[in-house]
């Protein structure tokens, strides 16, 4: 049984609302769902914000799908493992994690993330998951100083990479650039961890753990990255039980639903599927994969909409029902001792789908050009604001910047907070206002700032 200490909030609350019988995790879910940071996801594209097609997913619709898959995983595990029903005590908790998992991602996806990481290279770096942790615990104005003031277990679940930047960062041999246009993302991969500026919250989240559990949970190892030949930084090794479900749901949504977008838009073809995916499925060591998925490409690439949707449903169902609970008995705390994992053959199949999306969608020159453009916009905005914060920042952000300066804190983090919260469209228009001679009045922009 998990301890009640995991339901505690950093800032104690004594709100007594009339006839409010919601659980702590139902309250967490409501706070996330009604937050401005969550709403902004509707204007941040997931992968395919290309052209005039309105079919593609945004980060908001992606997060809703991750939530649906996450609760589906939990329901399956409750049936398979009745002995673990205490671990799976709240669907609202898992919904909260899935809905919130992308809240910290900046405008223009990976391009914006790399740009902010480069501009913050001497000030603690930038990474989307670290920013999510920061928004939930400090920035979103549900409370004055404690962000959404979520339960400790919710904050533990959002920690995909439970170690601070300083413990993971390895100084690399970067090529010096004289112009922002020369920046190569492969040379500036973000450190996957939380920011040192948020170590106080990190320590509070891990407070209930034994010293041994805390030490092992935050331990690191030499990193690797599927998109990079050499990832220079260290990586974390562990995540909580709730986080493992959220991450699997995210992976399934990314691999299956982003693939669906790409098929509909003609970016991934049947011949590419048969070349890159079909052989792995046909030769799988799992009988269900061989029988059900080997020929699924015919449905996926059918012009009959209902056949394609049926195939997508089959893929999602296959992965969700192949998830098991594994145990690592080195941990004492049940939330760390147990993790949700995919059966090995299904993990191979999911990875093949993810690689297909990466190869033909993410690396597509048109997508990379959009990322590059976003990269330039974000770096240009950061450079401008850093040059004269008290002149160019909105008044409320100026105040945060001044407070940070006066307290001897990392004032550059305030700039990263402001820019990372922008939508793609707002960042683009603000860039035009600052740098284009033909841009119009600032009145409309000022209303949004």
Curated annotation (Swiss-Prot):
Q: Name one GO biological process term.
A: dGTP catabolic process
One of the record's GO molecular function terms: dGTPase activity
Point to the regions of Basic and acidic residues compositional bias: 7-27
Please give the residue ranges the record annotates as the region Disordered: 1-27
Q: Which SMART domains match?
A: HDc
A Pfam family this protein belongs to? HD_assoc
Q: Does the keyword Hydrolase apply?
A: yes
Tell me the ranges covered by the HD domain, including all copies.
59-255
Q: Fetch the Gene3D superfamilies from UniProt.
A: Hypothetical protein af1432
Q: Which UniProt keywords apply?
A: Hydrolase
Q: Which HAMAP family match?
A: dGTPase_type2
Similarity-based family = Belongs to the dGTPase family. Type 2 subfamily.
Can you name this protein? Deoxyguanosinetriphosphate triphosphohydrolase-like protein
Organism of provenance: Shewanella baltica (strain OS185)
